[in-house]
Amino acid sequence: MTLQIGVIGCGAIGQDHIRRLTRTLSGARVVAVTDIDPTQAHAAVANHGLNAEVYANGGDLIEAPDVQAVLVTSWGPTHEEFVLKAIAQGKPVFCEKPLAVTADGCMRIVAAEQAHGSRLVQVGFMRPYDAGYRALKQVIDSGTIGAPLMLHCAHRNPSVGDRYMTDMAITDTLIHELDVLRWLTGDDYVSAQVVYPRKTRHASSHLADPQIVLLETAQGVRIDVEIFVNCQYGYDIQCEVVGENGIATLPDPQAVSLKHAARHAIAILTDWKDRFIAAYDIELQAFIDGVQGGALTGPSAWDGYAAAVAADACVRAQKSGAIERIEMAARPAFYRG
C-alpha cells in the first residue's frame, strides 16, 4: 500500500521533506500541497514533478478524501490548528516542531488524541533517530557506565540572522536538546536556570549569545547545555554523559582525516541539515511504516508537551535569572510503554 500524504507548508523544510518522500523514502507519495503563499505550493509541485493537487488552505487539504496522512511544516503558530483538524478527521499527522507554541496548546492536542483512542501524532524530533545518539543511548541503557550523574552538552551554529532573538535560543535551538536528553536519560526535568557568559562580538545587538542552560532531572541528574549560535567555525553538536563508572560521548559525524601542507585536519560541518540528514530520512520513514503498520512509535504528542513545558520554564529563567521549576501534568497511561 502506498500512503497518500498531504503537505501543509512548502517552505525550506517542507520542500526538503517533499524531496525525501519523492526520491528517497518508500511506501508514500505526495498527493496534495498547500502554502500560505500559493506560488510556493505551485513551485513545490513543479520542482519535484508531483502529481498533486494544490489546495487553498490546510483545512481543505486535511479534509480531502485522497489524503490519508498529513505532514505539517507550516509556520509554528499554525501547527496546533492543523494537528487538531487532522485528529478530528482521524488522519495520522507528522508535525514538525513545535507541536504547538504553548504547553496548553500541546495539552489540547494530547486530550484530542486520547479522545480519539489511538495514536495519530508524531512530532518531528529527529535526534532519537540519529545513529550517534542511538549508540549513546544503548551504552547508557546497558549500564556500562553506571547511572548517569551529569551531562555536558553544546549546540553551536556558525551564525544566525538578525531576526533571531534571545528567546529563540530556547524555542528554536535548545528545544532539540530538551527532547533528546529527556529521551537519553528516561527522566523528566524539574528545574531550569539560564546564565549568560561574556557576549560574543559576532552577535546582533539584541541577542544574548552565548547562553548556558542548567537543567536538573527528577532523579537528580545535572545537565549543562552551551548554546552558541554565532560560533563561526561550524555546526557542532556535543554530548558527554558522565556515569558512576565511566563516560560516554556522542561521536562526531564521520569525516576524512586529512594530512596536507603541514596540517592535520578533520572537516567540520556547517549546515544542520547535513549533520542530521540520515536522521530526517529515518524518522519520516518510521512515520510511514508506523501508519501502515497501525502503530506509531516515534516522538509523541506527550513528548511535544514535555518539551514545551521545559522550554517555557527556560524562557522564564532567561528573564528572571532565577532557578525556575518545571512542573508537568501526570503522564497519562495512554502514553506509557
Swiss-Prot record:
> Is DNA-binding one of the keywords UniProt gives this record?
no
GO BP, one annotated term = inositol catabolic process
**What does it catalyze?**
myo-inositol + NAD(+) = scyllo-inosose + NADH + H(+)
Pfam families to which the protein is assigned, alphabetical: GFO_IDH_MocA, GFO_IDH_MocA_C
Q: Indicate yes or no for the key word Metal-binding.
A: no
Identify which top EC class this enzyme belongs to: oxidoreductase
Q: Which InterPro entries match?
A: Gfo-Idh-MocA_inositol_DH, Gfo/Idh/MocA-like_OxRdtase_C, Gfo/Idh/MocA-like_OxRdtase_N, MI/DCI_dehydrogenase, NAD(P)-bd_dom_sf
| Alphabetical keyword list | NAD, Oxidoreductase
Q: Which GO terms describe its molecular function?
A: inositol 2-dehydrogenase (NAD+) activity; nucleotide binding
SUPFAM superfamilies tied to this protein: Glyceraldehyde-3-phosphate dehydrogenase-like, C-terminal domain, NAD(P)-binding Rossmann-fold domains
> Main role?
Involved in the oxidation of myo-inositol (MI) to 2-keto-myo-inositol (2KMI or 2-inosose).
* Similarity comment: family membership: Belongs to the Gfo/Idh/MocA family.
- Record's protein name: Inositol 2-dehydrogenase
Q: Which organism is it from?
A: Ralstonia nicotianae (strain ATCC BAA-1114 / GMI1000)
